[in-house]
From Swiss-Prot:
Protein name: Beta-defensin 121
Species, as recorded: Macaca mulatta (Rhesus macaque)
Alphabetized Pfam families for the sequence: Defensin_beta_2
Annotated family: Belongs to the beta-defensin family.
Gene designation: DEFB121
Cell compartments where the protein resides: Secreted
Amino acid sequence: MKLLLLLLTVTLLLAQVTPVTKCWGKSGRCRTTCKKSEVYYILCKTEAKCCVDPKYVPVRSKLTDTNTSLESTSAV
């Protein structure tokens, strides 16, 4: 009986823990630091980072190439 009471108490305490805030269409989680396998592009309302798995982030356009500059293309 004591074991059952202990189990019930622990379960109720774990249920009261605040849930993690979701972001990026429920694919990301608001954290202060992201895991090594995650990236962030926006901030959450609590000024935490919205950590997202890179496979859920849209691919960046190849128009912004850092190796070319406007000066070299306009000199032609």
